[in-house]
Amino acid sequence: VPGDYVSDAGALLASAPPKDRVLWEYRIAAASLRAGRFDEARIQLDAAIPLIGGIIADSKDAARARSLFHPENAKVFIGEPYERSMAYYYRAILYWRDGQPDNARACYRTGEVINSDLENKQWQNHFALLDYLDGFASAKLGADGSGAYARAQAEAGAVRLPPYDPGANVLIFAEFGRGPRKIASGRYGERLMFQVQDSPAHDARLTVEGRAVPLRCWDDLNYQAATRGGRAMDYILGNKAVFKSTTNAVGDAALVGSAVAAGDLYRDNGEKSQGAENTAIALATVGILSKLTSAATAPQADTRTWENLPQRLSFAAARLPAGAHPATLEFLDSSGRPLPGETRTVLVRVDDPAHDTVIFLSEP
């Protein structure tokens, strides 16, 4: 099915308007990873990621993305912070698979920044796996990853993260569940909200060579979507909605003021007051301009969604000798019991124990 999705989505990408291309590249990349089509995933992410950076840094699309006078769904899609972070997370997996942990680490660090509270300059990422893998890549490269590990553990809460094992040669990335969906709400449809559905799969377990490798949930994208820097997000769309309400209020008040001033055009003796006339004209002009500004503002939330993201992410590192190792993958419910119909056999193939083998596992 993922392979069919890749083909169908590729056709849609070919005909997609420029504003939607990154969205389709995200979707195809995720589906390609699950289908084992790693070259295709790499192509799509390498097409999407430079555009993300370009829009954030400076371009005509950047100015448009900040504009208050363009409908949100008319802008070039780059996604919410959790979506952009996931693009870098997936790209890092491919870098590590290609024997480039240094580039993988750069991706993790970029994802951390994207997922931080930049507006208040708190620089506090709450994506535990990004921090953990940042430190793990450092440890593999012979550097000190203890700071990143400490951040990851603080973010993971009750989940006790394993200490780094630089000698581990099998890196297991797992994902399960269905990620968040976007909806619009509010008076003007300006509030971006998320529909979330808790996945029956809360954790996973890979049994290989008689050893059970736990794959506990480290990060929940439902939580990541609704927060930034560990706090409830205040989207830029919220500011636009306030702007629309404020300009409406200014416009109404100004028009009322012009009517009052017009009523005072004549003094009690019947003579025309030039000052009142000028005030009435000025207030009426402000009122009309405010109304026009408010009408031109389009604060509707952008509900375009990278809809094939998972809900939960996990990671484990192990040591295995060279060879093909049959393994059993189970997805577990909240009580730790295997979910019926979710168990399958996978083959872990280690070609060279001196180099890292990257395994990517996804719930069907």
Residue positions per predicted region:
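Helix-turn-helix repeat elements of alpha-solenoid scaffolds
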Residues: 1-10, 42-52, 57-68, 100-114, ...
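Flexible helix-coil transition and linker loops at the boundaries of alpha-helical arrays
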Residues: 10-19, 52-64, 69-79, 115-124, ...
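Start-of-helix signal in alpha-solenoid helical-repeat scaffolds, especially tetratricopeptide repeats
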Residues: 20-23, 78-85, 126-128
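Structural motif corresponding to the intra-repeat A-B loop/turn of tetratricopeptide repeats
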Residues: 35, 98, 139-142
